[in-house]
Amino acid sequence: VFAVIDVIVGVLLGMKKAQNPGSMLDQSTSIMTMVVYGMPSWWLAMIFIMFFVYTIPLFPSGGMGSIPPPEGIASILDTIYHMILPIFTLFCITFWGRAYMTRNIVVGTLQEDFIMSARARGLQEKKVLYGHGLRAAAPPIVTMGVMSLLMSIQGRLIFEGIFNWPGMGNLYWIAVQQNDIPVLLGLLSTTTFVYLAGLAFLDVIYGFLDPRIKVGGKQ
């Protein structure tokens, strides 16, 4: 869930930044990217917990559900409620970098000759940006998005520990502490399979995103 929101918002913000490079939005968000990436991620997570749990008690400090657990539809809503703070924390840390990378990729693409030709034909700037620029810049952006999804499936050890979330990263750590070799092998095999499947998916989808790759393959 976090990875999907992160990729969508990051790409949209990056496209907006690329549309007006050097603008107030571009400069302010670029500075924010440097500030956030200069902070330890676990420290920012602890700050959010201190603020949203103890100063303004809006969310629980961690865990996947309340004790005792509710029943029925209330159980689903309770799980979503416990997911809000971890997802919000990860989102605030990672989507800035996603937007910055998208911005740099698209800005480079907008300098190409075919973009200037599209503008010379009188196409609307939005169509030039999303219809031509984004399509040409799609392969690296899609790669970035798929790798983000794969990393989210693998788990994030530090955040799962801070928020006491029972994910794959936390399971890795418990298996290492207990020297549980079968669990470690199972997790490693699952992670390897997921990554290989993701890379195979990227190879297939590249042919649809960039016709030059498809033609080169046929030759």
Label each region the model flagged:
Residues I31-G62, H82, T89-F95:
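Membrane-water interface segments at the C-terminal ends of transmembrane alpha-helices
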Residues V1-L25, S41, P70-Q219:
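Alpha-helical transmembrane segments of integral membrane proteins
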Residues Y54-P68, E160-P166:
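Peri-membrane helix termini and adjoining interfacial loops of integral membrane proteins
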